Amino acid sequence: MYKLVASDLDETLLADDHHVPGRVRRAIAAARERGVRFVPCTGRPADSVGVTLEELGLAGSEKNYTLSFNGGCLTRNSSAEPLTSCSLPFGRACQIYAKGVREGVCMHVNTLGPVYLYNYVPEERVYIQGRMNIVETTEPTLDFLAGQTVVKIVFMSLSMSHLERIEKSMRETGITEGLDVYYSGNRYLEFNAPGVNKGAGLMGLAARLGIAPKETIAIGDNSNDVSMIRAAGLGCAVANATDEAKAAADYVCEADNNTGAVAEVIEKFVLGA
């Protein structure tokens, strides 16, 4: 019997309108009535998940959790105070930021407070408007955050080939050595602290709750979800997932994020079990 379902948000749990489809809400509610925990697991900051938690009836719950920053931060849904968190070495963060400035990309610099946006292009404004605590910056270096925690840095481009070229260059010059680097959302290249991934975050939470790995389900769509898809007892990829995510999965959904993929998994493996 599965006791915990962890799901990515964007392009997995959420439809393209950034809301949870009704079928998915009903399936999650039914699973919770059976005592199964539902855990959002996102690359975004925890404070960007509030609307989703409200839609799922999980907001303010002391007994429920959210994994954010690709599993690098664990919070109770009743508090913004992290139970666990990780950070990039500041020197490495400075190198990544400098590369982003040279490349002219839009950058998210995630802290335990605001998300600092460099080169905040119109396409990104439309995409994330109202979902994060944003502070715009034009600073040419990361010195303005000296002494603060930088959780991760994200490069944004609508050209994945552009991001792939940048990542290859950074790998060849050693800037990303030892870091956990992922693509997500078909527009992001994410740089995380060593050992930070959704799989590790999920297994850490399961251990905290006394849940065995084989009793967990993970659902995702992109490269930053692969670690939890592999780590879970049942790893699932939505129909709109990347080939990499589908190859890692035990089960590939017929439905995509708009037609209730998360509900499909819960109905088949939790409610139908």
Task: Walk through the language-model features, giving the residues of each.
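Short, well-ordered alpha-helical microsegments
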Residues: 46-50, 163, 225-226
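Active-site glycine-centered loops adjacent to acidic/histidine catalytic or metal-binding residues
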Residues: 8, 42, 221
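Short, structured coil segments at secondary-structure junctions
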Residues: 56, 62, 70, 177, ...
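Conserved acidic, metal-coordinating active-site core of Asp-based
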Residues: 99, 103-219
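Mg2+-dependent phosphoryl-transfer enzymes with acidic/Ser/Thr/Gly-rich catalytic loops
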Residues: 1-4, 21, 190-273
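Asp-based phosphoryl-transfer active-site loop
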Residues: 2-16
